[in-house]
Amino acid sequence: MAKEMDKLVTLTRKEVLDLLAEGKSLADTDVRKANLMKIDFTGADLRNCNLSYANLKDAVFKDADLSGASLWNANLEGADFTGANLEDADLDYAKLRGANLFRANIRRASLPTELIPREDIMASVETGCKVGQKR
C-alpha cells in the first residue's frame, strides 16, 4: 500500500532537477501540471511518466525514452525531441508548435492532429524542421 501512495505524489520542479542531477530514472513518476520549462532531459528515462498539463516549453528531450508517457495537453512549444523514443506516448492536445521531432520514434503515439496537421509533424520527424515551420 505504501508504494501505491508514493505513486500518487506529484513531483515538483526541484525534485525533478534533483533526480536528473543524480542520474536517476523518472520512469512511472507523476509530474503533471509541473513547470518544467527549459529543463534538459537528454537521455533521461521517462517511460510511462505522467507529464499531462506540464509546461515543458523549450525543454530538451534528446535521446530520452518517453515510451508510454502521457504528455496530454502539455505545452511542448520549442521542445527538442531529437532521437527521442515517443512510442505509445499520448500527445493528444499537446502544444507542439516549434518543437523539433527529428528522428523521433512516434510509432503508435497519439498525436495532436486536431491542432497541427500530421504532415507538419512528419516533416519534423523526417527533416528536423520545427513543427509548423515548413522548410
Describe the predicted segments one by one.
Residues 3-135:
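Tandem repeat scaffolds
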